[in-house]
Amino acid sequence: AAGRGAWVRTWAPLAMAAKVDLSTSTDWKEAKSFLKGLSDKQREEHYFCKDFIKLKKIPMWKETAKGLAGKVENPKYKKDKQLNEKISLFRGDITKLEVDAIVNAANNSLLGGGGVDGCIHRAAGSLLTDECRTLQNCETGKAKITCGYRLPAKHVIHTVGPIAVGQPTASQAAELRSCYLSSLDLLLEHRLRSVAFPCISTGVFGYPNEEAAEVVLATLREWLEQHKDKVDRLIICVFLEKDEGIYQERLPHYFPVA
């Protein structure tokens, strides 16, 4: 009888964990631990949406760019078929992507705001804000990682972009580059293989869209050249048609189609 009692006590926490409801839970640590123990299929039951998008449904750049071969006469970089399989341009809702991590264009407080920041916090639920509160802010150009909670993405990487008024300075360009590199550092540190980036700093933070795209593409290209075997996909996720057009025009210069 004593042995049976010990068995019940041992397994009681697991029985409790199985009952965690992410929409009502008030303990982010408990919820985070619970989610880590689930399979990918089990996690689906806790997503905030049913129309989530799997990574395999997001086309690689080599597929998106069919028909563009040779249209760029003097690309900035050499053709690399392998790299063209590691990058994607996707227009849609970043909160619905089932990837290892999505990046949040946050403010210094990390407690939510407007634009994509607010969308991510609303979709993930209040537990995300609770965990962010423990991180005690984030400096511009740096990044911090949390659980994704009710998001299809397992993690959220929060980064704070520079605020630019008019033409960005060299310092602001360096800070924007640092946002991407800091986020990618966390990707490697946590052994994650897929990540989606929104357009960082281009909304209310005022960074010009075209100039931002140049910084982003150069940063991702150079990083992938060094780390291509450590990741499966880097996704540039845009929401506005304007940004989609900018990246469609600029991507072939940085990722020429083989």
Curated annotation (Swiss-Prot):
Q: Which family does it belong to?
A: Belongs to the MacroD-type family. MacroD1/2-like subfamily.
Residues found modified as N6-acetyllysine:
96
EC number of the protein: 3.1.1.106, 3.2.2.-
UniProt keywords (A-Z) are: Acetylation, DNA damage, Hydrolase, Isopeptide bond, Nucleus, Ubl conjugation
Residues annotated to bind substrate: 92-94, 105-107, 112-117, 200-206, 239
Tell me the classification of the organism that encodes this protein.
Eukaryota, Metazoa, Chordata, Craniata, Vertebrata
> Which species does the entry assign this protein to?
Rattus norvegicus (Rat)
What the record says about activity regulation is:
Subject to competitive inhibition by the product ADP-ribose.
Q: What does this protein do?
A: Removes ADP-ribose from aspartate and glutamate residues in proteins bearing a single ADP-ribose moiety. Inactive towards proteins bearing poly-ADP-ribose. Deacetylates O-acetyl-ADP ribose, a signaling molecule generated by the deacetylation of acetylated lysine residues in histones and other proteins. Plays a role in estrogen signaling. Binds to androgen receptor (AR) and amplifies the transactivation function of AR in response to androgen.
User: Is-annotated flag, keyword Acyltransferase?
Assistant: no
Q: Can you state which reaction this protein catalyses?
A: 3''-O-acetyl-ADP-D-ribose + H2O = ADP-D-ribose + acetate + H(+); 2''-O-acetyl-ADP-D-ribose + H2O = ADP-D-ribose + acetate + H(+); 4-O-(ADP-D-ribosyl)-L-aspartyl-[protein] + H2O = L-aspartyl-[protein] + ADP-D-ribose + H(+); 5-O-(ADP-D-ribosyl)-L-glutamyl-[protein] + H2O = L-glutamyl-[protein] + ADP-D-ribose + H(+)
Q: What is this protein called?
A: ADP-ribose glycohydrolase MACROD1
- Return the Pfam families for the record: Macro
